[in-house]
Amino acid sequence: MADDPSAADRNVEIWKIKKLIKSLEAARGNGTSMISLIIPPKDQISRVAKMLADEFGTASNIKSRVNRLSVLGAITSVQQRLKLYNKVPPNGLVVYCGTIVTEEGKEKKVNIDFEPFKPINTSLYLCDNKFHTEALTALLSDDSKFGFIVIDGSGALFGTLQGNTREVLHKFTVDLPKKHGRGGQSALRFARLRMEKRHNYVRKVAETAVQLFISGDKVNVAGLVLAGSADFKTELSQSDMFDQRLQSKVLKLVDISYGGENGFNQAIELSTEVLSNVKFIQEKKLIGRYFDEISQDTGKYCFGVEDTLKALEMGAVEILIVYENLDTMRYVLRCNGSEEEKTLYLTPEQEKDKSHFIDKETGQEHELIESMPLLEWFANSYKKFGATLEIVTDKSQEGSQFVKGFGGIGGILRYRVDFQGMDYQGVDDEFFDLDDY
């Protein structure tokens, strides 16, 4: 989906925030003991600490003893969390503390603090019976940056669009000779001069595009739109002078009636649909590439939990592709009376069979060390295996086929791996039934 690892990492961060928002929104507490605190990047920890001390004094006057104690406890937890930071991190700080009531009716303390993946320019302090996640949701609004090149016979404009913010990066005018009807021996010379000037103009546009849209050898925009009223945009897109890295990012060629800034505005209007579908298109392209590996039988692919984990351990996975709602769980169990641990990967159907959690020889239940959704474990661990993680949906035809046909988990490999010829030592086949995935 993303050509460069930084974009893929960002998508994983977005997935983590979505998951966190979901769990925070579902949480409810008794009274007003759930604190939501957001500190913007340039704020001071000392100011927030003083504000919390004042709040502690105010909360001491709450009449209800139970509510008073839980609010004071939550404020103390926030104060403890803030002590971990000397200053506000570059992207700001988000803290959620409080006592929530679980589905079983039990009370559970929640203490979460993290630096968001991009700056959060909101200041918030609220005590309520729920956590406030509106500012986090705003972070998720897709803010991919798109580049625009508006080119016609009178000049070129280079701009970007990010969210609702458009910016003109550079523009220049050009004086190209017009076609004319002078006859005689000069006609060919004029035509040659005209073509030469036109060629130089396209070259200048191509070179400027590299300066503006490529930084550190990587394209710095999610996609490019070429707009213009004449055939310059087509000429540019097909030209050998136009950098290959930029060429691969062209999303659309747009016909517009004006040049300059008016043309820029018109180009934005005419390309809104394609821009909103970029993630969808990237996903289709990624899964299409995965299917190509399979149809060409390159051996550079894996699917199913078992093979994918083996390939990860070998360091063979270049891109790990996982369905966003993969329901496989990862369990780490300790065999009773020993230090030996074993890891199981079970679907909801397999979880119902309790024999997975019982020692066959002694009949005793294994000690549960850790349990979490496999996708969450991947999101925390994928970098250790040298892979990039792409989390996909089943909204496209390709995505749906990936989920139904391949169990929603697979990978594109760096080199060919013969899974059938591999010896799966130490893996109990009982826990891996590929028919279940």
Swiss-Prot record:
Cysteine pairs bridged by disulfides in the record: none
Superkingdom, natural source: Eukaryota
Subcellular location: Cytoplasm
Name of this chain's protein: Eukaryotic peptide chain release factor subunit 1
Principal subcellular localization: cytoplasm
GO biological processes: cytoplasmic translational termination; nuclear-transcribed mRNA catabolic process, nonsense-mediated decay; regulation of translational termination
Xref: InterPro entries: eFR1_2_sf (IPR042226), eRF1_1_Pelota (IPR005140), eRF1_1_sf (IPR024049), eRF1_2 (IPR005141), eRF1_3 (IPR005142), Peptide_chain-rel_eRF1/aRF1 (IPR004403), Ribosomal_eL30-like_sf (IPR029064)
GO terms, molecular function: sequence-specific mRNA binding; translation release factor activity, codon specific; translation termination factor activity
A family per Pfam: eRF1_3
Locus of motif NIKS motif: 61-64
Protein family membership: Belongs to the eukaryotic release factor 1 family.
Subunit composition and interactions: Component of the eRF1-eRF3-GTP ternary complex, composed of ETF1/ERF1 and eRF3 (GSPT1/ERF3A or GSPT2/ERF3B) and GTP.
Gene behind this protein: etf1
Alphabetical list of PANTHER family matching this protein: PEPTIDE CHAIN RELEASE FACTOR SUBUNIT 1
Protein purpose: Component of the eRF1-eRF3-GTP ternary complex, a ternary complex that mediates translation termination in response to the termination codons. The eRF1-eRF3-GTP complex binds to a stop codon in the ribosomal A-site. ETF1/ERF1 is responsible for stop codon recognition and inducing hydrolysis of peptidyl-tRNA. Following GTP hydrolysis, eRF3 (GSPT1/ERF3A or GSPT2/ERF3B) dissociates, permitting ETF1/eRF1 to accommodate fully in the A-site, followed by hydrolysis of peptidyl-tRNA.
Keywords on record: Cytoplasm, Nonsense-mediated mRNA decay, Protein biosynthesis
